[in-house]
Structure formats: C-alpha cells, structure tokens
Amino acid sequence: MQQQGETKDQYNTFGLRLVRNSVGVSVLGLDGFVKFIKGGSGGSNGGSSSAKKIDKEEQKKFLKFRAFQAKIGTFYNTNFAFSFPLNETLKGWFDKHRGLILANALVKVTLDTKEKASKALVDAFSSYKNWLSEYTPVGLATTMISFYFDQMKALNNKLLERVRSLNQNVNQANPTPWLNGLSAKLPYVNTNGNYEKLNNYFTFLITKVLWPKVGTEDTNVSEEKSKLKTKTEDVNKIREKILNNIDSKLKTFVQKLKPTLAPRPAYSNVILLNINNDKVWSAGANWSLAVLLDPKKVNPLSFMLLKQMFDQNSLFKKAKTLFENIQNKAKTSGSGKSGTTTNDDADALSKVIGNYYYNTWAKLTDKSIYGNLKDDKFDDLFKLAFDSSINEKSFNVDYKAVIEHYRFIYTLEWLVDKNLKNFKDLLKANLKFGEIAFIAYKNTETQNFSNPQGIFGSYFNYENETNAAKSATQIIDPNSFFYKTTTKPEAKTTQSANTAVMVQNTQMNNQQTNSYGFTGLSTSSGSMLGAATQQAILDQITKTSLQQYGSQADLKKIIGETKNQLLLDRIANQLIALKPNTSGNSGTQKTIAAYFQTDAVGNPTLDFKAKQKLLLDVLDQYKDFFGNNAQAVQRDSGKSGTGNYLTYTDGSDKITYLQFSYKDIDGLSLSSSNGTSSKFASDVVAALLLFQAAYKGTQQLALSSINKPQLPIGDKRIKTGIDLLK
C-alpha cells in the first residue's frame, strides 16, 4: 500500500508488478520499500542498483510500526493484515543450530562478574573464548552460505513448478491449451534450468555479507565491471572459492586442536578423540564425531577413507586419465574442433560416453531442471546432470554418486587395459562356443525425439527457456529411449518390397543427425529387449545362420576333434532346423535326419564315431549359412565394422541386429587402425564396454583385484558408512 508523502514517480521507481492468478489481476508492490532504501536516485531506471542500500534501522522501525498497527487494530482498511511471526520463523533455525548460536552468543556477551554464577561461567569459559571467538562465526557463516545456495536452487524449482501444469495442458495426449487462458511466459530468462538474474539477491548476501566471515572476497571471481556475476558458471566458481576459504580455516583450526586418538575403553572398538588433554574439548569433539558417524546415512569420514583407497591405486590413476581424455575428446568433437588426444581408446569411447551421462539424467524425477537441449545435442544436457551429481566442490556432496563413478571408471579401465583382455575373458566365460548371441538397435517409427513426452516444456515456452522446446513426442519413453552409437546400421531386406529401412533420428531444422536405440549384447540368458522379441530374434538366427561356429572349416575341425557328445547333439539340433542345399557337389545321399534315428527299443542306431562322420559328410549342404548371403546391406562410410545387419519387425519397432559369436571376441577392438578387419565398429565395442562397466557384478569382479590396504579402524560406525556406499 502507498504511504503518505510518496509520489507516483517515487513508487514506480521501485516497480509495481501486475500478477494474474485465480482471483484476477492484482497490482503488487513492497510495502514501505521507499522508506528504508537509501540512495540510487536519478535516472529513469532508478539509478545504479549498486548505490542503493537498505537502512536496517529504518526497516526495523517500519516493521515495528506495522506490527503495532496490527496489534491495536488501527488499519483503516479491514481487509489489510500484517503478520511478522519472528518467533515461529526463527525457532526451526535455532533448534537446528542451537550449539553454534549459543557459542556465538557466549563469545559476545558481557557478564557481570560480581554475581557468582556469572563469574563462574566467565571463568569456565575464558580458556575457550579466543578459539570460539575466531571459529564460531565461521561455522555460522558456513551454515548460512550453504542455506543460501540451496535457496537459490529452490527458487528456480518453484518457478519451474509454476509452468509445469501449463505445459501439461498443452502436451498431454488430448491437449487443453484453453485452460491456460492468458497465461504468459515468465519474465525471467531460463538458461540450463536456472533463472540467473534472480541469483543476484543470494550472491549479494553470500559474497558481501557472509564471505568476509570465512575468508576474503575475490572480486575477480564475484564481480564484473563492479556488478555481481549471476551466471551459473560464475556462481559455481564463487562457491568453489568460498569452499577453499572454509577448508583453509578448518585445517588451521584442526591444527590448533592437535587431535589424537584416545585410549579405547575395554571391550570397545569405538574411536575416541583426545584434544590437548582437555576434557571439555575432547567431549565436544567426540560428541561431534558421534553426530558425524550417524549409522543411518553415509558419512564423510567413510567416504574419505574409501576415496583414499581408490586414489592410492595405480590402475585407478590410469582410469582417471582415461576418463579425462574421453571428456576432452568428446568436448572438442562436439565443438567441431580437432581433438588433442591420440588415444584410440578415448577416441572410440568419447563417441558413446553420452550413454553413461544419460544414466544420471534418466534417474531424475524432474528431467527439466537442467533446461532444454540446444541443437538437439542430448549429450550436452546429460553431461550437466552428470557433472552436478558427482561434484565434490559442493556443500552437499552426493558421496554415493561419487563412489559409484569411481567404481565405474576403475572398472572401465580394468576392461580396456591390455587390449580389452579382461573384457574378452568375461565374454568367453559367459558365452559358450556355438551359443547364439547378437547386438541390436531398437529403432522406433518416429522422426521427432527432441521433446519426448513433453519433458522439455512446450512450444509456448512458458518457462522462457533460451532453448525453446519443440512439439511434444508422446510415444517415446524418456527413461529408456536414448542408448546410442555413432554407427549407422541401415539394413535392406529382400523379404518384402514393403519393408522399409527404419532408423531412429533426431530432427533439427530439417537436418537429420543419427542416434540409435542401442540395446547392447543379447544372449539366451539376458537382453535389454523384451523377452518375446529376444527369443524371436534368437529363433530367426537359429533358422538362418551357423556363424556362431565361425567358418565352415572351423566347424569341421571342431566336429572332428571333439569328444563331447552334448556338443555334437547341439550342432545336429541346429542343422535339423535349417534347409540344406542338396544341389551340385553337396547333393550326397546322406541327411541330418539319420543322426536322430533309433532302433526298435529306442537306442540310437549310430554310435559317437558314426554321428561324427555323418555331421562331417552333410556339412557341405549348409555352407550358405556361414555368411549373410540372404540379405544385402548398406553401411556408413568411415570407421565402421564389416558386419551385415539384418532386421526384425516388432509392432511399431524394427530391430536392426548383427549376430555375435564366440569367434568374434578376439577381434574386438577400440582402434580403427590396428590392421584387423573387425565385424563390429569401434564405437559399438565402446558402447558394449560402457554397459559392461556399469554392471554391478563386473564392478565387484574388477574391484576384487585391487590391492586393498588394511584400514585399522574397528569402529562399526565407519564400517556401516562404507557399506552404505556400496
């Protein structure tokens, strides 16, 4: 409400706002703002914001005046209400930080030492006052800084919530845009999920009020041309710099405390601390340690011990270097610049690393919190989510996510090391010779993948995103649509003229870029595809191929040398499902049916040697099944494998697949220049490696080979914390 003595120009200087809500259109302004803001006069825009200051004493007087009016009921407008419940507002804060607040009060209070109780308190507190005077304000300021960074994100989320229902009305299967009425986009621009202009309020409090309490503000980081920086990357740098200051203060404080391990009580392994042989300091330290080692949640001490185990491992150091090279290669490739690394492993893995980033994004309940994709570059968006999840320079480190990342990159290096030795050994241990397997791409019949199920808003752009959303795609599940490689498997079938080549594309300005639903390696025991689709493709391969045995010569050698009846039976069962070619030189009078003949009492008519000879005699009839002669294929030019892809139709999806056999394992490589002719493109192998490295069973196997240092802890609370990180 406007106060007496305020002019129209004065009031407009601080801005009225028109707000439309369920009751209509309202005009809002801050009550009494012109009374306690000093400076900033002149100019149509109200002068420089840096020249305006809050007169706290005037603000207190104004709030007290309003509270007095409310209490005695003197408001001339009965619809006007004023509430400033300070006690209720501060109670939760006080209860949560009671120790810090009381310590801060004690170092500042002046007590009358003539009174015995006060003198006793002063005497008892005197030996601790200097240290507490120095470090208690640091603790309080740290708590407030963390709180304001959290509130910065909370404000963004509140604004995004406002537009969520509006977008839903537009994006749902049966749109009802009229329910949004005259709703307009937010007045603030959203970049990567952040309303950066609104960061100014929080960055002012953090840098100007609180930073000096924990260190010294670095204006090179926080300001540009005497104005506060508010962009997300700048806010992150401010936070990192402040955390460095806090860390320095804490290290100095700990050095002064000189903590040592105290003798343990009998029959106890609980860690206890001794601080300068002072019972009070020691009791406080052990109380703090007990709070820190809460067995119900991951604690930072357990995290640091586990992190130390990784950091001291030589293979993990190689893993960190590999992942850094992958990220650098992916970054330069995405920007159109030439890469700086010549590492073939990193080169191939960088093309598919988005699959790893995607796993973090897919777990998000709200997939719009990092904004919209730009130029249909999903990997850039996924990386924002990934980087945020493993950020160790934060007030709220996700310890579990960081350790999971460490496990992943360690396992990836373990698989890649020595020309994929461990990866190949794993495949050989789990894929029997002659077993049918395949790699596949699930290609959905749609051209629009840029806004699956409307998760990036709507074309009305209510959130005022810099990267405006496109029309929603309803048929794509955002939780499972993105797995990809850069290889383009286009298969032409000769079975039907109406069978079209299906590929999964993203579309941007009528220019298509290739992304495919890569589903990894499927075997009889497991697949990312549905069970029915998996079995149908396995059956289709069984009826059309013998590639699982390598070449015809390879299979003849195996049959001639084996002593295994079960292996002969498996080969015979696969041959019986195929149609033999009995023309020409292959037209012997023998058939595979004789293999299964029995006498009157059900005993086989052929012994092992006879069955062995029969298989060798009839094998020429099946020579066409050792290649892909049945179907022609088109491949992308460039670094790709030599294998031929086939297709299988499953409703609205088409599965493009390539058979994988035991004999293919040794030829797998991440290098496109190793002199071998691999059936699988290097980026396909890279994608398989990423999937394998993310598998918990593989991680456990890889980590079992780590040289585990013995940690002489014995404290169950730390062990529980480490278990929670697994």
From Swiss-Prot:
InterPro entries in the record: DUF3713
Pfam family of the protein (one): DUF3713
Family, as annotated: Belongs to the MG307/MG309/MG338 family.
Protein name (database record): Uncharacterized protein MPN_440
